Amino acid sequence: MDPERIPYNSLSDSDATGKRKKGGEKSAKKRLVASHAASSVLNKKRNEGSASHGGTWVIVADKVEVSINFNF
């Protein structure tokens, strides 16, 4: 699923049955959304063949360990 189309309530504290999600499940979902969003942006930039003009990145996660290398 495209991260831009993931409904906001899919990141909520409860699932479709009303049961509360565990912390690990919420964190995993947030990491998945952030990862797909970053991949999507990088692929669009790469496919367009244009130079990067900067932008605003918002990553939502409980814990973040990231190593990112940009070669434009």
Curated annotation (Swiss-Prot):
Changing V41A: In strain: Infectious clone UK. Residues 1-54 are annotated as: Disordered. Residues 19-33 have a biased composition (Basic residues). Keywords: RNA-binding, Transport, Viral movement protein. It comes from Turnip crinkle virus. Interacts with Arabidopsis thaliana RCD1. Transmembrane segments: none annotated. Belongs to the carmovirus double gene block protein 1 family. InterPro entries: Tombusvirus_movement (IPR007982). Cell-to-cell movement. Displays RNA-binding activity. One of its GO terms (molecular function) is RNA binding. This is Double gene block protein 1. One of its GO terms (biological process) is transport of virus in host, cell to cell.
